[in-house]
A protein has these predicted regions:
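Alpha-helical membrane segments in multi-pass integral membrane proteins
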Residues: 133-145, 156-163
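Short, hydrophobic transmembrane alpha-helix segments
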Residues: 26-34, 54-64
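Membrane-interfacial loop-to-transmembrane alpha-helix junctions, especially the N-terminal start
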Residues: 8-13, 63-74, 126-135
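Non-cytosolic membrane-interface motifs at loop->transmembrane helix junctions
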Residues: 93-104, 155-163
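Internal transmembrane alpha-helix with an interfacial aromatic "cap," most often the third helix
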Residues: 53-56, 87-88, 94, 103-134, ...
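N-terminal secretory/membrane targeting signals
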Residues: 1-27
């Protein structure tokens, strides 16, 4: 497959993803001008969409050893954008903090960030796979412990200490 074909395919994927944005951006109810939490969800969502486009476009401009980490960055920001659009809708509909959805987002994106960290580290120097697994297991323990503490499964302090 030629480089031009790959660039065209990436551009088509980005265009297709961005064409879905109006549907994701359409809240069931309208944000009120003084709803700063809802507005912050909206701003974060849009920033994440812009970051996604940036990371995917930049994969065509960097050396090969950086392409995978930029692609993972784009995936992280895309997944987070979708979750933040959804969290905004939950906030507007209920007026409550969407804690469970925030942790679902983190359970997906934080491990991806650890993968990205490992990829960047590996691009710079020789590292063992053991580092990757220690960081990944620590990440999962931190997230599950934090969630358990936040929702009261093991008390706030128990979750704080574990997380």
């Amino acid at each position: 497959m030629s480089l031009i074909t790959i660039k065209g395919a990436k551009a088509s994927l980005i265009a297709a993803a961005l064409s879905l944005l109006p549907a994701a951006a359409n809240a069931a109810e309208t944000l009120k001008a003084d709803d700063y939490v809802g507005i912050s969800f909206w701003l974060i969502s849009m920033a994440l969409v812009a970051a996604t486009a940036f990371f995917f476009i930049e994969t065509t401009r960097v050396q090969g050893k950086w392409k995978t980490s930029l692609t993972v960055s784009g995936l992280v920001t895309l997944i987070a954008a979708v979750h933040y659009f959804y969290m905004r809708d939950v906030w507007i509909a209920t007026g409550e903090t969407p804690t469970v959805y925030r942790y679902i987002d983190w359970l997906i994106t934080v491990p991806l960030l650890m993968i990205e960290f490992y990829l960047i580290l590996r691009a710079m120097t020789a590292v063992s796979g053991g580092i990757f697994w220690r960081v990944m297991i620590g990440t999962k323990v931190m997230l599950v412990g934090g969630y358990a503490g936040e929702v009261g499964y093991n008390g706030e302090w128990g979750g704080f200490i574990i997380g």
